[in-house]
Structures are given as C-alpha cells and as structure tokens.
C-alpha cells in the first residue's frame, strides 16, 4: 500500500481546504534568526562531495541611495573585495581574492557579487571544505562583508576607474541599456525609480567624498537586512553553531533607518515612453498591464502556489499562440512573447507584459497582431485541449524535479533560500510540489483559468515602452498614435481561437526493426552495440541525473563537402528543417504533440560533421529516438514556414549595421580570414542568394547514409529497454548497407579557411554613442593536438588572465576586465589560437596596450607567476571533481575521443599535477615565436 504523508492526504481528500492551508518549509533546510535580526539558511547536500557554497544576501540596493550617493550601492559591492578587517591584503593578512584562489575558488567564476535596485548578493561558491579551516575562513569572509569592510581612501580611489570602465562596458553597443535609462523618468515620474539603476552617475562615482560611501555602508549593511546561506557537503548543526558564534556578536543599530519599499502608483491613462538610439537595429515594444503584488505575508498558503500555477498555464498557452503566428509566410512581427512578474525595476508592483519586435514597414500591423491574441485570450479564454497540453507540460516538469531531487547542485538550493529571503517565495519539497501539481491538474478547471486571464490581461493601468532606431528612413509614430494603436486593437471584435483536433502518432507505421549484430565493451565504461545498418552505438550508463538521457548521432561530412558558392545557404540548412516540423506534422502541430513529453532533438551541420542531438526523460526515450529517426529519414518541407523565416530575417536585418559591435565583428572576421567567401556575414542582400531547394538538398545529402554514423547515449539508460528501440528506430535509418541510402555524387572536401598567416595591427574608427576602444588580439601557431597541449594552453590563459586583472584592472583601473580564451583544433593542421580582448577609454588605449603585450612576453621570458600557476592547477583539479558527476562531461569526453582521437579524461589529474612552469612558458614562447599575430582595434570617432 502506498504511504502518504499527512499533507498529501489533505491534498487528496480535501481540495477546498488546500487554498487556505499554510505551507510548511522544506525541513531539509535548517533556518533561524539571531537576536540581532540576521537570518540564516543551512542545508546539507552531498551531490558535490567536499564542496559547499557560501552566500550573504542583503535586502538593500540602489533604491536606498541618496541623490549624492548615486552609484555607491554598486561601488560598495566592488569594495567588498578590496580589504576587510580579517583579509586586509597588506602583507600581514591575505586579501579575499588571493586567499580564495589559493584554495581553488576562482574570482569571477566562483567568487562574485551583484547589486540590483532592491538587493545585493555576494557569493563564494564551489569551496573545497575538506579542511575545517577553509570552511571557517569562508564564513569569516561573509562576516567581514556584513560588518567589517575597511573602505580605505586609497582603495576607493583605485576602484573609481574600474567602475567607470564597467559603465563603459555595459553601455557600449547596448542601445537598450541607454534607452532604458532615458525612459525611466517618464515611466516612474515623481518617484525614486526615476533614477535608480545600480551603475549610477559617473560624475558621482569619479568624485564622491569617501564619507558618502561609508555612510551608506553603515546605514544599510546591518544584520536585520541580511541572510547567511550555506549549502553543500557540510554538517548543518556545526555550521549553525559557527554562525551563531561568529555573527551573533554583530550589533544591531539602536536607531536603524527604516527600510522603505517605495510604491508605484496606478495610472488611469496609458503612460507612453519612447526613445530612439542610432545604434538600435529594430523597434522593440513592451506593453505592461500593472497590478498589485501579492504581499509577502500572503505567500505562505497553497492558494498562492495555485495562483502561480494558473498564471504559468496562461503564459504557456498564450506564448504557444504567438509562436504559431510566426509560422506564417509573412509573419506580422519579428518576435513576440508574454511574461508576468515585477514591473520593470520595481518589486512593489507587478505586471503582465507583451514584448514584441515590430516590422518597421508595418508597425501598426505588429501591434494589431500581438494585441489581438492577448484580447482573444482575455475575452474567450483557452480551449480544453490547450489547457490539457499546458497541464501535461507542467506535470512533466514537476515529475523531473522530483526524480532528480537528489541530483541537484548546491546552487539549486541556494536559489531557493535566496528567493525566500529576498522575495518571500515559499520553500517546499519536490515531493510536495509534485503532489500539489497533480492535485491542481485534477481540480483546476478551464473556467477558473479563463477567469484568471481577465485579471491578468487588462486594458487598464497600462504602460507602453518603445525602443526604436534613430534613422532618418524610419518614421516612429508619435506617442499618441502608438497609444491609439493599442486602444483600437483592444476595442476590436475578435473570433475565439480554434484549432484542429490532434490525431495520429509521430510514426503511424513504425519501420520493421533491424538487428544488433555485435556487442562489446568500449572506452570509458561504455557498452558498444553494432547495428545491422552500420551505425555504431556507444552507451554510457550513469546515475548523475536520474531522469535524463542525452543522445548524439553524427557522421563525417558537413558543409566542407560543398563549394564556396553554397556558403549563403549554410546558416539556413538546419533552421529550415526545424521550422518545417518533421514527418507528417508541421512545427506547431509537432509542438502540441510533444507537450506531454520531455524529449527533443535538434539537427546541426558544422564544417566537417552533421549531427542530431537531443535529451529526454527516461520515460520518453522512445519519443526521442522516434524524432531522431524522423529528422534523419523523414524531414519535412514547408515552403510557407521557410519563406516566413526569410521574410522575418530580412526585416530584422534592415538596420543590422546600426550597432558598432556588428560592424566591428564583420571587420574582425574579414581581417582574420581574408574576406573568405565561407566566412561572410548574413546580410539582407545575402538572402537573395538563399535557395530553399538547395538548402533541402544539402540537408538530405548530409543525412542520406547512416552506415558510418556513430551514436552516443549518456545517462540513466536501461540497456535492456534500449535494445529494441535501437533496432526499431536507429538500425532502420537509411544506409548503403541495407540499400536504402541515396548517395550524392561528386563530393569533394572544400577546406575551411584558417586564420591568415600575418603579423599586423589594424585600427579603424567608428561613431559610437558611448566612447570606447575595443581591442582583440589573436595569436595563432601550430601545436600538436594533445591533452597536454590543451592543458598547457588552459593554464596559460588562466595565469595571463590573473596577470591582466592585477595590472590592467586593479593597478591602472583601465578596464572592467581583460578576457583571455583559447582554441585547439586539428581541422586542416593542428592549430592553437589565443585571443585577448578588452574595452577601455580611447584615451587609455595607448597606455594599456603595451601592458597587455608585456605580460605575455614576461611569461615567455621568465615563466608564469608561481602563485598564479598553483591557483590555476588547484582550480582545475577542483572542477574536475565537479565535472565527472555530470552527463555533459562524459558526452564531451567520449565524443572527442571517438571523433578526434584525443582522451581528455584518462590521467587528467596526474597531467595537471605534472604540468610545469616550463611547459606553460614554452607554450607562450611558441606562441610569440610564430609571429602570427593580428590585432584589430575599433575606436570611437
């Protein structure tokens, strides 16, 4: 007999009591509040052995700044990494960043923070806590962030430049960010939200008195507004005792300032806020319908979760309708979606939002089409079949969350605690949630959902925000005209939504099965099955995610078998297929048929391979293999869908070059590859050379013969259940071995271009709304394609990144960050590439560039900094332990060994330990000795 907990019995027996029933917090969390008001959440999680995450969350943000402090909430976040009482960085005690990196916690990846309008959160993630001293030190950092920042004059002045460069990075090439800053005074007129974005005023950042920052810290960083969150392989009771001892001594201010949550007023007439920017490529519209938030104290009942459930169904169904419209031959908009949540930047007001990209030649038509669907839903609701699909999908998500409840990484539970502390969202178990969804699916009716639609979607309390290109050829309708577009569309008469009844199976008549002709043990613990049509299947059984199976089916070929003249078609080959649906079903029908399934497959074609990749739940493995069969053997043509996609793309590309970043990227690729025809960007004129017939032919030829294809399955696979499915859906793929393949003729490999052999610097200027210099430096050199070479490159880019952080960011305050990345390939010849990227003030470019080159030369001449190299190796060893319990890692390792002949797994830890400074130095030396360096810089005029 199935055993139910009391709350489950309540759900099953008394639906009318559920709505008012108080929720019990997930008992796996140890929570409490100290006398000084500090809240804590502690949870044991053994998924990542020896690893824990440490967070401090603050219910404070930029909305609490005084006018003279604009930007200081965010500035303070930066200062938390620049000196605290116990981590001074003065030679007597280490600074926070060096200490964390000495134990394998990487700045940026594991050690970070963010500031928003109403909250500030700091994290030390993926901390190896095998030694108690490390755990104690992580808690001590949280303690210092809470109460003991030094905020010295010297460090404040050093950070001003870094903040200014972050402002430059966030605004450069991001027109919507700039326009949002400009529309907020209209949207929030008369409130603190008019000017509240965290980056603040650069005039204040550059010049504020030190006292203003210290005043903000003293006033708002206090225990009654803070929470400590610790999740991972720890003993909760012991951590709780440490928190009480360490944080309990922090005093609570006697006359603490009131933490005000500023309200947002309703509006009778629509507020219209428009803005234009010369770097904005398309017209974006956001129509908000404001409504009151649920008070935090009312989020503790089952009724609150039921309301959220109904809202999620409404959004799912409405977005499905909007997606259908995009399949038309001439789609009425570029994109459209529906959302619900906080109104813009304010947590004190919620809103339903319609977000859509307008066709510039028919702005009114875009408004009409999007609002028509929201009005249709508001007036007539949704059909029973739509509701059933949405409920099925919601149940599948809950079932997966329950099945994988013990497979969750630490951040999953951290986010639960954060949402509870910052937004009062309830923390419930996956078992409770699953039973709740099942009960909602049984008891929530279409009438209830359709009543809720009328509350969510309204013609009152509306705000329209429009971002548009600032181009002479584009005429933006006046604000009153845009308002009239909305009101007229909301006043029209509409017919109810209707759809044909779904019938049939994905594959009405399954193919007669093939056979398994051989089985053997394979690499990395795989089982290898040879199929009768020549496909070789590798199965890696894992229990890392209880309800996940991933597949990959690939073969040699790709676009390199087609001439340069076909290059305009390449970007559309796979999208043309997926936009058409598959088998007998168009894309919209296929989406509906898969609503109750957790399965999907996507084709892709690269330079040298064609692949089908997908994921599914354990129960839906059959569906995933059916889709694999259909995309290989029975792709679908849909001229209307293809023409619609091309038409939408043509409209989207109208102002493609408006963004300077696009022009820069085009120039970058042209310089690197010498304007090679296979490396050309897609522009409006390119679309005229795209042929659907040719796109279809390329796809069919790439997936014509499975005889030399390889399949890899990774996950919770039942091999006995898998065998008949492989015979039915994989062994029957067209193949020269079973005489079902249609072989293309005259195939010849056309090599993909390499980066040019050159040593040169290119600089050009372009008008930008945010002055900046954007620099990319590429080094290419021949390097053996081995695991050791890959590791040496990895460590080189990490120690170089550290050197740049110290010299360019911290010492000079010259950039928000220098990015270093690498590639190692064996396509035409084994080649390595190192890429260095940064953005800065044009006035600082000449000063910073020599430093960038000098740091690399220093490593080539003298070797890497020993401390930096030790930190990089510790980080790699730590992440290796995290990676090997992930299905994606095994998919990557096995695929690359089968495809490229390189084993990234075996002996990796020893390889890391044995890597020497001389190995890294030699890699840097080889890189410089190649004399193949291309620098491309774009400066503002």
Q: What are these regions, as identified by a protein language model?
A:
Residues 19-42, 235-323, 327-329, 388-392, ...:
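Proteolytic maturation boundary segments
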Residues 1-22:
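Bacterial Sec-dependent N-terminal signal peptides
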Residues 148-156, 444-448, 452, 636-642, ...:
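Peptidyl-prolyl cis-trans isomerase
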Residues 148, 155, 160-161, 213-244, ...:
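Non-catalytic, conformational "gating/processing" segments within enzyme and secreted inhibitor domains
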Residues 155, 160-225, 229-231, 236-244, ...:
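Hydrophobic, small-residue-rich alpha-helical packing segments that form membrane-like cores
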Residues 41-43, 48-65, 71-73, 91-144, ...:
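M16 family metallopeptidases and their MPP-like homologs
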């Amino acid at each position: 007999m199935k055993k139910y907990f009391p709350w489950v019995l309540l759900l099953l027996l008394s639906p009318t009591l559920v709505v008012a029933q108080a929720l019990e917090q997930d008992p796996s969390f140890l929570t409490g509040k100290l006398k000084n008001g500090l809240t804590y959440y502690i949870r044991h999680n053994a998924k990542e052995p020896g690893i824990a995450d440490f967070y401090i969350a603050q219910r404070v943000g930029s909305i609490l700044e005084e006018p003279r402090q604009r930007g200081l909430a965010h500035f303070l976040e930066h200062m938390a990494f620049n000196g605290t009482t116990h981590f001074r960085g003065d030679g007597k005690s280490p600074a926070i960043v060096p200490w964390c990196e000495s134990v394998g916690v990487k700045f940026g990846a594991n050690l970070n923070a963010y500031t928003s309008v109403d909250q500030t959160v700091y994290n030390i993630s993926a901390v190896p806590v095998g030694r108690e001293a490390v755990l104690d030190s992580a808690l001590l950092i949280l303690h210092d962030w809470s109460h003991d920042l030094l905020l010295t004059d010297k460090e404040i002045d050093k950070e001003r430049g870094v903040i200014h460069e972050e402002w430059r990075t966030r605004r450069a090439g991001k027109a919507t960010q700039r326009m949002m800053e400009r529309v907020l005074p209209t949207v929030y007129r008369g409130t603190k939200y008019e000017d509240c974005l965290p980056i603040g005023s650069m005039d204040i950042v550059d010049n504020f008195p030190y006292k203003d920052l210290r005043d903000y810290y003293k006033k708002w960083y206090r225990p009654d507004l803070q929470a400590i969150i610790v999740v991972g392989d720890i003993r909760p009771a012991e951590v709780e005792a440490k928190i009480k001892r360490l944080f309990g001594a922090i005093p609570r201010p006697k006359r603490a300032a009131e933490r005000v949550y500023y309200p947002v007023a309703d509006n009778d007439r629509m507020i219209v806020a428009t803005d234009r920017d010369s770097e904005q490529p398309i017209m974006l519209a956001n129509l908000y319908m404001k409504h009151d938030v649920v008070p935090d104290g009312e989020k503790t009942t089952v009724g609150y979760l039921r309301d959220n459930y109904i809202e999620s169904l409404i959004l799912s169904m409405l977005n499905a309708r909007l997606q259908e419209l995009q399949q038309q031959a001439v789609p009425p908009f570029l994109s459209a979606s529906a959302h619900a949540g906080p109104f813009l930047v304010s947590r004190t007001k919620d809103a339903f939002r319609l977000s859509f990209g307008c066709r510039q030649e028919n702005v009114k038509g875009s408004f009409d089409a999007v609002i028509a669907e929201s009005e249709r839903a508001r007036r007539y609701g949704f059909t029973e079949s739509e509701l059933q699909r949405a409920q099925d999908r919601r149940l599948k998500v809950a079932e997966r969350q329950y099945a994988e409840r013990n497979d969750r990484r630490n951040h999953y539970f951290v986010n639960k605690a954060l949402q509870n502390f910052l937004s009062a969202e309830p923390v419930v178990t996956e078992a409770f949630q699953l039973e709740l969804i099942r009960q909602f699916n049984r008891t929530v009716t279409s009438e209830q959902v359709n009543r809720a639609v009328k509350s969510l979607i309204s013609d009152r309390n509306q705000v329209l925000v429009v971002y548009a290109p600032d181009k002479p050829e584009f005429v933006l309708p006046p604000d009153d005209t845009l308002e009239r577009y909305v009101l007229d569309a909301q006043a029209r008469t509409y017919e109810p939504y209707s759809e044909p009844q779904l019938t049939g199976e994905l594959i009405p008549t399954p193919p007669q099965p093939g056979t398994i002709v051989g089985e053997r043990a394979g690499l990395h613990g795989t089982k290898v099955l040879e199929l009768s049509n020549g496909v070789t299947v590798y199965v890696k059984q894992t229990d890392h995610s209880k309800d996940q199976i991933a597949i990959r089916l690939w073969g040699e070929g790709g676009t390199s078998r087609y001439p340069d003249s076909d290059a305009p078609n390449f970007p559309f080959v796979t999208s043309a297929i997926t936009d058409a649906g598959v088998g007998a079903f168009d894309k919209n029908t296929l989406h509906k048929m898969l609503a109750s399934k957790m399965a999907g497959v996507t084709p892709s074609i690269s330079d040298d391979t064609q692949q089908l990749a997908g994921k599914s739940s354990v129960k839906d493995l059959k569906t995933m293999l059916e889709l694999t069969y259909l995309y290989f053997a029975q792709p679908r043509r849909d001229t209307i869908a293809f023409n619609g996609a091309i038409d939408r793309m043509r409209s989207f590309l109208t102002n493609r070059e408006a963004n300077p970043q696009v022009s820069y990227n085009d120039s970058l690729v042209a310089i690197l590859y010498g304007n090679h025809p296979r490396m050309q960007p897609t522009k409006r004129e390119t679309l005229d050379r795209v042929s659907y017939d040719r796109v279809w032919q390329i796809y069919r030829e790439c997936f014509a013969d499975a005889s030399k294809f390889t399949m890899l399955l990774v996950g919770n696979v039942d091999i006995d259940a898998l065998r008949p499915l492989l015979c039915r859906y994989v062994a029957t793929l067209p193949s020269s071995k079973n005489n079902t393949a249609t072989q293309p003729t005259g195939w010849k490999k056309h090599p993909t271009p390499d980066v040019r052999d050159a040593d040169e610097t290119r600089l050009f200027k372009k008008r930008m709304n945010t002055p900046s210099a954007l620099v990319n430096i590429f080094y290419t050199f021949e390097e053996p394609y081995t695991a050791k070479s890959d590791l040496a490159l990895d460590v080189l880019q990490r120690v170089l990144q550290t050197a740049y952080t110290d010299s360019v960011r911290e010492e000079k305050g010259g950039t928000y960050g220098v990015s270093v990345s690498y590639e190692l390939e064996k396509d035409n010849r084994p080649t390595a590439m190192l890429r260095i990227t940064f953005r800065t003030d044009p006035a600082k470019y000449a000063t910073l560039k020599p430093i960038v080159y000098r740091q690399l030369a220093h490593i080539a001449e003298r070797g890497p900094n020993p401390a930096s190299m030790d930190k990089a190796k510790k980080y790699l060893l730590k992440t290796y332990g995290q990676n090997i319990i992930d299905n994606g890692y095994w998919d990557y390792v096995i695929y690359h060994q089968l495809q490229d002949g390189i084993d990234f797994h075996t002996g990796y830890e020893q390889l890391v330990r044995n890597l020497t400074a001389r190995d890294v130095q030699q890699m840097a030396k080889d890189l410089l000795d190649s004399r193949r360096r291309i620098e491309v810089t774009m400066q503002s005029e």
